[in-house]
């Protein structure tokens, strides 16, 4: 679809709102609302990352031998890549773990071999969106590679170069030897990087929910990891009020239940979806108040009888801290928390937490709208794509392949970054760190299984971000329910109305 004048004006409008946000003239929530009205929503993980922007870290230091190119790959960078020495490739992305790790690695390894300079600007997601909408509206070449939240993939499909078409050109010297596109975890391609069968970018990151439990507590009580939702609740009840060796009290469940915060919406989806509910049904219908959703809400409130004090003030950061402090025994949440639990100066529970397969949902709804996919493994992720407006496309394509290649994915996994390539999950350095240690990868098997079999995706329509994000009506109403200020029926009725209004704004 060629960009029309209405689309162009919408993009320029979003770019202008981004500048207002950066100048402090509007709030982030207002930016999300205005961007949504222009047709640019943000995914679940995008909202999470937006509110947990990482501070700059010291450059990554890899152990000897972790980053290993094949001889053909190294020769290709030194010969084909070197043709573009002196070229600068520009990319703007969020400041996430993979962006930090790979940008550091580019300075250390890619630039010396090729002579290509990588200008990687790391910003909040709202500013990334502002840049991309400005660039595409004006067909500017100011960024050569786009970082795309999964909710934007369909909107920018015509502004990118199809990477599969480039990879399928077997005669091109610009294609990286041994790149092996089929090594990407296949479930990630349609979820993060494709639109209506057309590849838009290449998978880059994948936050996802996993089941984490206190093995020391389970062992003491003779428990096994839950395989069903009923068993999970039984384990929550059985572990609640457990007395640890130091005399501290362990509660049954740790939530991310901060009233009005997007984290609460994330937590809620696990119980909604696992009970056969969903936000949407066929043809844009909103089903959030049906009997399945009611069952999910009641299950959530039952968990709420077994949580530490203060849970309704915790976002995902508070939840992660509570895990590290040993305040609970069961969690279904973001796998990104897990490596920090094995760091002695951050955690009182080093080695105590384990992962297990997510408990099976009672049932799953299969007929939904707006790309919603109910499943307990709440996911979110992004891809990176080649701009069709870039004036240095060949150099940018060389870098894009290197940045998403198996050797780089394996090196990034050294810092506990969740891989998007199958080979990285079984690489020797990854398996070596599957033990209790800083930078552990012992949670990776649970992550891979969640990606391949249990991924759940929130709806993707423009108004979703403003409705479900922090300060929006959905987490605000959920907060009333989890604090006892409002009953389930009223809460779900109000959420239904909010979602219907958000859809109507398209």
Which functions belong to the PLM regions below?
Residues 64, 85-96, 116-121, 144-145, ...:
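Short, well-ordered beta-strand elements
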Residues 30-56:
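N-terminal export signals
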Residues 60-83, 150-209, 249, 264, ...:
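Hinge/lid segment of periplasmic solute-binding proteins
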Residues 191-204, 209, 233-286, 292, ...:
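Extracytoplasmic/periplasmic solute-binding protein
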Residues 105-187, 216-227, 322, 329-330, ...:
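Extracytoplasmic "Venus flytrap"/periplasmic binding protein-like
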Residues 439-498:
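C-terminal capping/gating helix-and-loop segments adjacent to ligand/active sites or protein-protein/ligand interfaces
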Residues 235-240, 282-313, 357-361:
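Glycine-centered hinge/linker elements that transmit conformational signals in sensory
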């Amino acid at each position: 679809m060629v960009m029309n004048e209405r689309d162009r004006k919408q993009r320029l409008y979003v770019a202008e709102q981004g500048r207002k946000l950066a100048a402090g003239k509007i709030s982030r929530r207002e930016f999300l609302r205005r961007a949504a009205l222009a047709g640019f929503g943000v995914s679940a993980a995008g909202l999470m990352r937006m509110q947990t922007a990482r501070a700059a870290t010291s450059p990554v230091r890899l152990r000897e031998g972790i980053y290993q190119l094949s001889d053909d790959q190294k020769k290709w960078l030194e010969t084909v890549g070197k043709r573009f020495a002196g070229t600068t490739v520009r990319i703007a992305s969020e400041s996430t773990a993979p962006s930090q790790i790979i940008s550091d690695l580019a300075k250390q390894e890619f630039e010396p071999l090729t002579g290509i300079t990588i200008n990687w600007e790391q910003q909040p997601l709202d500013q990334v969106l502002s840049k991309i909408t400005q660039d595409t509206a004006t067909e500017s070449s100011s960024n050569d590679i786009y970082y795309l939240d999964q909710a934007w993939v369909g909107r920018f499909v015509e502004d990118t170069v199809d990477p599969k078409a480039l990879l399928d050109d077997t005669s091109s010297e610009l294609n990286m030897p041994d790149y092996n596109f089929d090594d990407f975890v296949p479930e990630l391609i349609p979820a993060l990087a494709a639109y209506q069968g057309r590849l838009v970018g290449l998978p880059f990151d994948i936050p996802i929910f996993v089941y984490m439990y206190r093995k020391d507590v389970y062992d003491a009580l003779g428990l096994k990891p839950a395989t069903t939702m009923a068993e999970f609740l039984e384990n929550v009840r059985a572990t609640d009020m457990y007395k640890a060796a130091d005399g501290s009290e362990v509660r049954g469940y740790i939530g991310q239940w901060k009233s009005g915060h997007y984290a609460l919406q994330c937590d809620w989806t696990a119980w909604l979806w696992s009970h056969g509910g969903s936000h949407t049904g066929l043809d844009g219908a909103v089903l959030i108040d049906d009997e399945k959703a009611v069952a999910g809400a009641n299950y959530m409130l039952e968990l709420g009888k077994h949580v530490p004090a203060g849970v309704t003030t915790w976002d995902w950061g508070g939840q992660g801290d509570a895990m590290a402090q040993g305040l609970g025994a069961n969690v279904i949440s973001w796998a990104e928390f897990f490596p920090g639990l094995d760091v002695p100066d951050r955690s009182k529970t080093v080695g105590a937490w384990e992962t297990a397969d997510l408990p099976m949902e009672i049932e799953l709804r299969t007929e939904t709208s707006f790309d919603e996919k109910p499943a307990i493994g709440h996911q979110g992720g992004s891809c990176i794509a080649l701009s069709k407006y870039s004036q240095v496309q060949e150099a940018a394509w060389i870098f894009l392949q290197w940045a998403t290649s198996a050797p780089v994915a394996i090196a990034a996994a050294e810092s506990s970054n969740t891989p998007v390539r199958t080979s990285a999950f079984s690489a020797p350095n990854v398996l070596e760190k599957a033990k209790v240690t800083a930078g552990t990868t012992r949670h990776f098997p649970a992550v891979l299984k969640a990606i391949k079999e249990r991924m759940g995706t929130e709806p993707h329509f423009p108004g979703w971000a403003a409705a479900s994000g922090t300060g929006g009506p959905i987490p605000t109403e959920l907060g009333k329910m989890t604090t006892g200020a409002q009953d389930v029926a009223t809460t779900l009725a109000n959420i239904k109305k909010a979602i219907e209004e958000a859809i109507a704004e398209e």
